[in-house]
A protein has these predicted regions:
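Residues in well-ordered beta-strands of folded domains
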Residues: 54, 106, 133-135, 155-157, ...
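Cleft-lining beta-strand/loop regions that shape enzyme active-site pockets
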Residues: 4-124, 136
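Polar, glycine-rich mid-to-C-terminal structural blocks
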Residues: 115-122, 128-141, 148-159
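Active-site lining segments that contact anionic ligands and/or coordinate catalytic metals
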Residues: 75, 100, 127-132, 151, ...
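Conserved functional hotspot residues or short segments at active or partner-binding sites
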Residues: 145-217
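Short, well-ordered strand-loop elements centered on a beta-strand within folded domains, enriched
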Residues: 54, 60-62, 129-132, 145-147
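Single conserved hydrophobic/aromatic residue that forms the stacking wall/gate
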Residues: 1-10, 212-215, 219-221
Length: 221
């Protein structure tokens, strides 16, 4: 979600994968600090028919930003990888597809938790600029992405868990708040899969091979 035009590029790539008849797709948003809100909305729209993607609350009121394209580019299994460094537009993409029940989110205990919009105001050539928080992002389920971020459906232990990363680590971070949910229709196609997959993930982490791998990874870092 870092540059303009990514939505069109991603749409072509999704079509290429469909042509190859892939059994599923994984979107890796780990270490993705965000980017264009417009692109995040367009990418989310590739996986749903239509509907709201994110709510933006500012001084003038509330905007509900939708996916305007009723076409679905891909309807198959979808996983999104996140970690504590997934922030801003990345969190919006993950949150929207989680709220719709369209993707399974996998990763750290939570994403970064940056649910605010900043605007630069010039103070003149000699005085520089002032960065002000002017708006906040809200999921379509009504919860903010601020502070708490997005909690994955399946949590995988990470070295980042012991690091002070995320909005909640800041001394004066803005709080998590809620607003009224947007009107949207959630799919229940993956609801029953998540407990099963989560249990399987825990079982794999309890194997000797996984413990051995983690020991070597910790020693490396």
């Amino acid at each position: 979600t870092r540059s303009r035009g990514l939505g069109d590029v991603y749409k072509r790539q999704v079509q290429d994968l469909k042509d190859e008849e892939v059994e599923g797709m994984i979107i890796d948003l780990r270490n993705n600090g965000g980017g264009s809100l417009v692109e995040a909305i367009e990418i989310a729209g590739l996986f749903i028919k239509s509907g709201p993607i994110v709510q933006v609350k500012e001084r003038r009121g509330l905007q509900v930003l939708p996916d305007a394209d009723p076409e679905i580019s891909y309807e198959g299994p979808l996983i999104i990888l996140v970690n504590r460094l997934s922030a801003s537009a990345s969190e919006i993409l993950a949150a929207a597809l989680q709220d719709y029940g369209r993707a399974i989110i996998v990763g750290d205990e939570h994403t970064h938790g940056k649910g605010t919009v900043q605007t630069l105001m010039s103070l003149g050539e000699k005085k520089g600029s002032l960065k002000l928080t002017t708006a906040g992002f809200y999921r379509i389920n009504g919860g903010s992405t601020q502070l708490r971020g997005v909690r994955p459906d399946i949590i995988i232990p990470s070295l980042l868990d012991v690091m002070e990363i995320g909005e909640k680590e800041l001394e004066h971070a803005l709080p998590w708040t809620t607003i009224r949910p947007a009107l949207y229709r959630k799919s229940n196609t993956i609801k029953e899969c998540i407990p099963v997959l989560s249990a399987q993930s825990i079982d794999r982490r309890n194997t000797v091979s996984y413990t051995h791998l983690r020991a070597h990874e910790t020693a490396y870092y």
